[in-house]
Regions:
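Acidic/glycine-enriched connector segments
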Residues: 1-154
Length: 156
């Protein structure tokens, strides 16, 4: 089972990191219980993508890193790529559509998409979520409040 992930960057997560980390870990455990092999597809952006990558490595789950374009990697990115089953770059350099194309590839390649979303209907997380729904993908959502408020674990 290929599990894609999308969600907000740190600025929109606020103090919700621990709940996000726990939820992703719980979902990975749930999928592992089916007996299927489980791997995570992450876009490796700061925030939810990197939280998910770290959780997957801790849980012994394969990781597929889908970067929007080639760049100088951070130490964290290098540490995940070293363990990754695959690493791909949508483009050799930045182009305006690189993030959208990377996000669509994650959706196209995954069996289920985990979405950490604050409910605001703009931005990359929302458009990736909508693309998944429009293309009949199974989607699981952890709705978080807008950054700065407390997290109530609400599902949409």
């Amino acid at each position: 089972m290929l599990v894609g992930v999308t969600g907000h960057r740190p600025e929109r997560l606020g103090t919700n990191w621990p709940v996000v980390e726990r939820w992703i870990g719980d979902k990975i455990n749930e999928y592992k219980k089916t007996g299927e092999s489980v791997s995570l597809i992450t876009g490796m952006a700061r925030g939810v993508d990197q939280i998910a990558a770290r959780v997957a490595v801790k849980k012994g789950v394969g990781v597929h890193c889908y970067f929007p374009f080639k760049h100088n990697m951070t130490d964290f990115e290098k540490s995940i790529v070293e363990r990754a089953e695959t690493t791909r770059f949508e483009y050799d350099k930045y182009v305006p559509q690189c993030y959208i194309d990377r996000d669509r590839r994650i959706v196209d390649d995954c069996d289920v998409l985990l979405v950490v979303w604050d409910g605001v209907k703009t931005g990359g997380t929302y458009y990736t979520y909508k693309y998944a729904l429009d293309n009949g993908k199974k989607v699981e959502v952890l709705q978080i409040p807008v950054a700065g408020s407390d997290l109530n674990d609400r599902r949409i």
